[in-house]
C-alpha cells in the first residue's frame, strides 16, 4: 500500500512540475519577430515580448547575433515596465519614426535576415533566444534547440503559445503570414500542449491501475 501511494505521489509531483515549468513565466519571452518586409525594412521591423503586466524591464538587453560570425551587431537596453496587457512591442526607427502598430518603444533594430539570432538577456544571463533561418555547419546558432523557420518576405515568426516554452525554437515558433504586433493568442483559447496532455493521461492511467489492484 505504501509503495502504491509513493508511486502515486511521485507521478503527480512530476506531472505538476512539468506543467509548472512549461507555463510559469519567470521572465519575459520573445513572442514574435518580424525582420524581412516586402521591400524596404525601414520602420517596419519589430520585436514583440510577452510577460507579466507591471514586470520591470530594467536591466534587460535585446541583442541581434550575426549567424556568420557570432558577433553582436545590435544591442538595445530596455527600461520601464511591461504594459498592462503583458505585451511589449519594439518598433524599428526609420529615422523619422516607425510604421509598426502598437509600438511601445521605437529604436534602431533593423534585424538581419537569417540565419541569425535574437537574444533577450537579463542580469542573470540569457532569458530567451530565437534563431531563425537555415544554419550551415560553420554558422553560429544562438537560439534554443533547433532554428525557427525562415519565412518569406512580409511574414513573421511567432510563438505558438506565449505561455509555453519548450526550449526549442523549431517547436515553439511558426510562420505568420500577416504579422500581428501587440497581439498574442488568448491564453484561454490555447489548448494544452500534446506532450503535457499525453503525460497527464499516462499518469492518470497509472493511478487508475494502482487503485484497481
Residue ranges and their predicted role:
Residues 11-20:
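Bacterial N-terminal signal peptides
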Residues 211-213:
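C-terminal outer-membrane/trafficking sorting elements
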Residues 191-209:
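A short, hydrophobic C-terminal helix/tail in secreted or cell-surface proteins
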Residues 27-153, 160-161, 167:
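Activation on beta-sandwich/Ig-like modules and their edge loops
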Residues 2-11:
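Bacterial N-terminal signal peptides that target proteins for export
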Residues 21-26:
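Sec/Tat signal peptide C-region and signal peptidase I cleavage site
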Residues 166-189:
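A recurrent domain-boundary module in secreted/ectodomain proteins
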Amino acid at each position: 500500500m505504501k509503495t502504491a501511494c509513493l508511486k502515486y505521489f511521485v507521478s503527480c509531483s512530476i506531472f505538476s512540475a512539468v506543467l509548472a515549468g512549461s507555463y510559469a513565466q519567470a521572465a519575459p519571452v520573445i513572442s514574435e519577430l518580424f525582420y524581412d518586409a516586402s521591400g524596404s525594412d525601414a520602420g517596419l521591423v519589430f520585436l514583440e515580448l510577452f510577460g507579466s503586466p507591471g514586470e520591470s524591464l530594467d536591466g534587460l538587453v535585446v541583442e541581434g547575433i550575426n549567424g556568420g560570425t557570432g558577433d553582436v551587431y545590435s544591442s538595445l537596453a530596455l527600461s520601464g515596465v511591461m504594459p498592462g496587457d503583458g505585451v511589449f512591442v519594439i518598433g524599428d526607427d526609420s529615422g523619422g519614426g516607425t510604421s509598426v502598430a502598437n509600438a511601445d518603444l521605437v529604436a534602431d533594430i533593423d534585424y538581419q535576415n537569417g540565419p541569425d539570432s535574437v537574444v533577450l538577456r537579463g542580469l542573470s544571463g540569457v532569458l530567451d533566444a530565437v534563431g531563425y533561418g537555415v544554419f550551415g555547419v560553420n554558422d553560429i546558432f544562438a537560439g534554443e534547440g533547433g532554428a525557427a523557420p525562415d519565412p518569406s518576405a512580409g511574414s513573421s515568426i511567432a510563438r505558438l503559445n506565449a505561455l509555453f516554452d519548450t526550449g526549442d525554437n523549431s517547436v515553439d515558433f511558426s510562420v505568420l503570414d500577416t504579422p500581428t504586433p501587440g497581439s498574442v493568442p488568448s491564453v484561454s483559447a490555447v489548448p494544452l500542449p500534446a506532450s503535457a496532455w499525453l503525460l497527464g493521461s499516462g499518469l492518470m492511467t497509472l493511478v487508475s491501475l494502482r487503485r484497481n489492484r
